[in-house]
Amino acid sequence: MPWIQLKLNTTGANAEDLSDALMEAGSVSITFQDTHDTPVFEPLPGETRLWGDTDVIGLFDAETDMKAVVAQLEQHPLLGAGFAHKIEQLEDKDWEREWMDNFHPMRFGERLWICPSWRDVPDENAVNVMLDPGLAFGTGTHPTTAMCLQWLDGLDLQGKTVIDFGCGSGILAIAALKLGAAKAIGIDIDPQAIQASRDNAQRNGVSERLELYLPQDQPEAMKADVVVANILAGPLRELAPLISVLPVTGGLLGLSGILASQAESVCEAYAPLFTLDPVVEKEEWCRITGRKN
């Protein structure tokens, strides 16, 4: 169905108040957007970190009387009569279909392809992971996921056990299994991610070799030959004591979700127990790998 969009500009400090005002005026959803396209990285849990100059965008049903909406908003103390705004009619689109049409098979390293479950594989003889991301992250399109997939593709995983810490869609754990790992363990704090991983594992015929846990349910003294964690720099630093004990002696560690500017602090957290390789960078992100001492 078609929609009407109302956009207004404000400061980050006032964005939440104006979001509430738009919802009270009948908006069905709110989007915060940086006026100047400045990225915001790594908000704290539960935090909505906003920009100094923020566009607040309300989405309204096409039948909404926008003159009445504007009149109501003019009564808000942060806006007033004649406040600056922009109203647009949005064309009707099948957004899910548009997203699916833009998700194409991607190659990582020498052997590995990530393929949308609704498309044909480009190479039947390759290692093909059929993926439906569902509600969890992890399609291979982000540089951090891509670097982790390339790293796994370059390893000899035959008969190995792999832990995917923060498994999301299960893409890394499933890729490891398809690349020869005997067993993979996925851990995530989000039950939706656990379900997406389970569904994708079944789609790829590896569900019997994949164990999935919420953190509170994971077995004690869990160990693996290879541990990969594609989360964020803050949690990687904070969880270093927990993650560092997961690889066996001589086991391998791969970390990503890290901005290049954060690499040094993450390396410092893991250097006491690992011999670290040179940091690999892709765009503004990086990957840290090493071997357990």
Swiss-Prot record:
Subcellular location, principal: cytoplasm
Annotated Gene Ontology cellular component terms: cytosol
Key words of the record: Cytoplasm, Methyltransferase, S-adenosyl-L-methionine, Transferase
The reaction(s) this protein catalyses: L-lysyl-[protein] + 3 S-adenosyl-L-methionine = N(6),N(6),N(6)-trimethyl-L-lysyl-[protein] + 3 S-adenosyl-L-homocysteine + 3 H(+)
Record keyword Translocase present: no
EC number(s) on file: 2.1.1.-
Location(s) in or outside the cell: Cytoplasm
Keyword S-adenosyl-L-methionine: yes
A Pfam family this chain is assigned to: PrmA
Binding-site positions, S-adenosyl-L-methionine: T145, G166, D188, N230
Biological process terms in GO annotation: methylation
Major enzyme class: transferase
UniProt-recorded Gene Ontology molecular function terms: protein-lysine N-methyltransferase activity
HAMAP family found in the cross-reference section: Methyltr_PrmA
Job of this protein: Methylates ribosomal protein L11.
Family listed: Belongs to the methyltransferase superfamily. PrmA family.
Protein name: Ribosomal protein L11 methyltransferase
Gene name tied to this protein: prmA
